[in-house]
Regions:
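Cap/lid segment of the alpha/beta-hydrolase catalytic domain
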Residues: 389-510, 517, 551-552, 558
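Short loop/turn segments that connect beta-strands within beta-propeller blades
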Residues: 52-55, 95-99, 176-180, 226-230, ...
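A short beta-strand motif characteristic of beta-propeller blades
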Residues: 6-10, 58-61, 102-105, 181-186, ...
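Predominantly five- to eight-bladed beta-propeller fold
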Residues: 45, 128-175, 209, 220, ...
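Short, solvent-exposed loop/turn segments at conserved positions within beta-propeller repeat blades
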Residues: 39-44, 85-89, 163-168, 214-220, ...
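Conserved beta-propeller blade repeats
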Residues: 14-29, 64-80, 108-123, 159-164, ...
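Active-site-proximal cap/loop segments of hydrolase catalytic domains
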Residues: 467-656
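Non-catalytic accessory segments flanking enzyme active sites
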Residues: 19-21, 124, 149, 159-172, ...
């Protein structure tokens, strides 16, 4: 069968295989499969079960719903998960022996997360509760007249949501599985995050900041709580982002991941272990100059829930690590030994490890495979493919294999990837599109990226790079962008373009395009304001004015401080690094794409840029996406994701 080129509509053909979770017996597992439904314009997911000895896969849940975070009871006889089948996220449990899943909660605001009690008779969970109410409150106040909202803190907005509900806090409770009776464990007017439950069922680790003013407080202390007495032991109280807690098998050690604000929010994450016997904490990964976790970005994967760490019975810890475009599984011992457990040039976006560390279950994507489930023997590296959800689609389409490139810009080494157009013919010349990722502390890597394949299928070469500010190349490299927006990162991108123009004679340098989102949108705006070498540009969810961003974005006031190293007391610096200042220089036709419920990079940024360019008589158009937030390209409504890609390809087709 002759293969066809990738199409925008293939978003509906590929499936996202994620979240493998081994049963306590290590002989079976569950995982989640998510797909886009064209008719309902929705995402639906289902839990699947696999017998590892036979490879038999069985679908366990059905219906038009999303399910997430399946977890086994300690005896392996029950499986709990969160589902939105009743509109709000609630907790459900099903028997391994069979039968329909049963709802355990009916909380007014839904639930966020949960952990089994090892006794198997109750489940701990967290969720939002309004002041004066409990998890058992079921009455919704209908027909209430609109009321003014009094805001007294600076962190009062969230992406898509907008203004956050007032007097609502995340609390922790538990539900009796037999009776569905729900009990409240916390009630203080602070947000409580459920992190972990000990294997003996006597302790919780929760995260809670009890400071009343958190405008400039970025701590979320980890607290060890005795369930019976509610006595607390502080594990960590430091400015930064920490979590993903896991008890060792004997409960002596408590592992967690995260980072302090040494380099603001671009500090590389590490794996820490707290020893209950002496109250000491060790950093297991301090010697690795790369971030713990998955920093790779793509537009295909859904619900990529991966544990921060997994303990084995011999007190080894397994975790993800992002480096040089790879996301690999690593292992560490308490005496400091660290080694990779998987290979290079792939994206291990989900995993679980057998108790005896004999094997791991992995969900893995590559540049030409959206992802499947695998079993890998730890000692030998031998790998067996367990699922084939995307196999039929892969048989139908011709994917382009990106080529890894390395180049230098002065003393800076930069990695990137170059894709030739589909159906490339030697001797012909083609237009090239430069893609720029957001963050800026993110990482392009060895993973499937639908947008890149679509552009190649449309006849474009694609160049995507990890310039300064990207994760995966050292702490100094990712930190280099702070205080230098539009500086070294811009130069790295231009140097990468110059490099491929020098080495690849198929690129038509008179037909260059550029696009990017978030920081990539900022950089797109900056580029067209500082060079006219591009013939078309598409800026997405972008920033053009740091002065207004400071007060309008939900992260504005601290992000500008951390990244621009300036605030409203240094307006000149904010304006000098604002692309809007250079709007008069823009000669490149610019398409502006923005989501209306983006509160990270608010749509007012796009509005300012559009009106300014129109007023100056520049070639520009503005497309607004309703009911969409900052994550439109990844998790937006399917029809709008399709429309977005059509807008991008249509603009480049018009001008290139």
């Amino acid at each position: 069968m002759k293969k066809r080129q990738v199409a925008i509509e293939d978003l509906f053909e590929t499936k996202s295989v994620t979240n493998p979770v081994l049963a306590p017996n290590d002989s079976e597992a569950v995982f989640t499969v998510t797909e886009l439904n064209r008719k309902d314009n929705a995402y639906y997911s289902a839990i699947h079960h696999i017998e590892l000895e036979t490879g038999a896969v069985t679908r366990w849940t059905y219906g038009k719903q999303q399910v997430r975070a399946p977890k086994w009871s300690a005896d392996g006889k029950q499986l709990a998960f969160i589902s939105n089948r009743s509109d709000t996220d609630q907790l459900y449990v099903m028997q391994k022996a069979g039968g329909e899943a049963r709802a355990l909660t009916n909380c007014t605001e839904g639930i966020d997360s949960f952990e089994w009690s090892p006794c198997g008779k109750k489940i701990w969970f967290s969720g939002a509760v309004r002041t004066g109410e409990t998890f058992s409150t079921t009455e919704k106040k209908e027909g209430k007249m609109p009321q003014p909202i009094r805001v007294t803190n600076m962190k009062y907005k969230a992406d898509f949501v907008g203004v956050l509900p007032q007097e609502v806090y995340t609390q922790i409770g538990y539900v009796d599985i037999a009776t569905c009776a729900v009990f409240d464990f916390t009630s203080e007017p602070f947000d409580h995050t459920l992190e972990a439950v000990s294997h003996d069922g006597k302790q919780l680790v929760i995260a809670v900041n009890r400071n009343k003013n958190v405008d400039h407080d970025f701590s979320l202390p980890l607290v060890l709580v005795d369930i019976e007495t509610k006595n607390e032991t502080m594990i960590l109280d430091e400015q930064g982002y920490f979590g993903e807690v896991a008890f060792s098998k004997d409960d002596r050690y408590i592992a967690y991941t995260g980072y302090a604000l040494t380099f603001a929010n671009v500090t590389q994450a590490d794996v820490f272990v707290y020893d209950q016997s002496n109250g000491q904490t060790m950093n297991l990964t301090a010697g690795i100059d790369a971030p713990i976790g998955d920093e790779s970005i793509s537009d295909h994967l859904q619900q990529t829930i991966a544990p921060g760490v997994v303990w084995t019975e011999d007190e080894q810890l397994y975790f993800q690590l992002s480096s040089m475009g790879d996301v690999r599984l690593y292992a560490a011992t308490l005496d400091g030994a660290i080694y990779p457990a998987t290979g290079e040039e792939e994206h291990v976006y989900g995993y679980d490890v057998a108790t005896n560390a004999e094997f791991a279950l992995l969900t893995v994507s590559t540049m030409t495979n959206p992802g499947e489930l695998y079993r890998q023997t730890i000692a030998t590296g031998e790998r067996t493919k367990l699922t084939s959800f995307n196999e039929d689609w892969l048989k139908k389409v011709e994917l382009v294999e990106p080529e890894t490139i390395h180049y230098t810009n002065g003393n800076t080494n930069v990695q990137g990837w170059l894709m030739k157009p589909a159906n490339f013919t030697e001797g012909e010349t083609y237009p090239l599109i430069v893609e720029i990722h957001g963050g800026p502390h993110a990482m392009y890597g060895f993973t499937y990226f639908h947008e890149m394949q679509v552009l190649a299928a449309e006849g474009y070469g694609v160049l995507y790079l990890n310039p300064r500010g990207s994760h995966g190349y050292s702490q100094a490299f990712v930190d280099a962008v702070r205080g230098d927006y539009g500086g070294g990162g811009y130069e790295d991108i231009m140097a990468g373009l110059d490099e491929v123009l020098k080495t690849e004679n198929w690129i038509d340098e008179t037909r260059l395009g550029v696009t990017g989102g978030s920081y990539g949108g900022f950089m797109t705006n900056w580029i067209v304001g500082h060079t006219n070498r591009f013939k078309a540009a598409v800026t997405q969810r972008s920033i053009c004015n740091w002065i207004s961003f400071f007060g309008v974005s939900n992260i504005g006031y601290y992000f500008t401080d951390w990244h621009l190293q300036a605030g409203m007391k240094d307006v000149d610096k904010l304006w000098n690094q604002s692309p809007l200042k250079y709007a008069e220089n823009i000669e490149t036709p610019l398409l502006i794409l923005h989501a209306e419920r983006d509160f990270v990079c608010p749509i007012e940024q796009a509005e300012q840029l559009y009106i300014t360019l129109k007023d100056l008589g520049k070639e520009t158009e503005f497309v607004r996406f309703p009911e969409s937030d900052h994550n439109l390209s990844r998790t937006g409504k399917p029809n709008l994701r399709i429309a977005r890609l059509e807008e991008i390809t249509g603009w480049f087709k018009r001008y290139l």
